[in-house]
Amino acid sequence: LCFKVRQNLLDPKRLALKRAMDLFLSVVGGIAIFPILVLIALAIKLESRGPVFFRQNRIGRGGQTIHILKFRTMVCNAEEVLQTYLRENPDLREEWEADQKLRNDPRITKVGAWLRKTSLDELPQLWNVVWGEMSLVGPRPIVDDEIVKYGSAFASYTRVRPGMTGLWQVSGRNDLSYKQRVHLDRFYICNWSTWLDILILAKTFPVVLGRKGAY
């Protein structure tokens, strides 16, 4: 089954359909939510100094580096705040090193915390989708340090564009272990279809509203 579906991922017609759906939905969606984007930008500027957006390096299709766009959710001196926090709370270093996440992250602003819980901080990635660096649905974008955690699954990861949403997001998000996340990403890649994308997109909205596994 996995072999057959991997051939589908290489099928130009199927990939063209996926790309067309990405382009149409991201453009229409971006226009529809533009007023919301403006309000979020104003809230960020009013709460803390610094830019509204920030870019992060991630690994994209073919192993190439892409620069994903997000709303800024942290203070400007985030790295300094993090290192101080970990020094003062050494028991939390293991939690940080395991998944690069903290349940009570001191770097995150009040507006940023709300944006993360609702996943609204990732809306600017619609631009990455339009540009062709990401897909609406796909594996969670990873950084270089995560390659070793993916192991043999990394080869599968680089076959497709990373997504704004995916099986991980609709299956528990941060409540899942990293191993479970890799398994879900690999399952998606090996069982990809247009209908699976539609199902994940449909499930994304209630998951976001419910905020399950978000922090």
Please report, for each region that a protein language model flagged, where it lies by residue.
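Short, glycine-rich, amphipathic interfacial segments at transmembrane boundaries or analogous
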Residues: 1, 54-106, 165-184
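Juxtamembrane amphipathic/hinge helix adjacent to a transmembrane helix
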Residues: 1-12
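Compositionally biased, charge-rich terminal segments
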Residues: 9, 180-195, 215
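A hydrophobic, helix-centered structural microdomain
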Residues: 13-81, 128, 194, 199-215
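Residue-level signal for short amphipathic helical patches enriched in basic/charged
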Residues: 31-34, 118-121, 137, 173, ...
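Short, hydrophobic secondary-structure boundary micro-motifs
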Residues: 40, 54-55, 83, 137-139, ...
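A short, structured surface patch at a secondary-structure boundary
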Residues: 95-161, 200-208
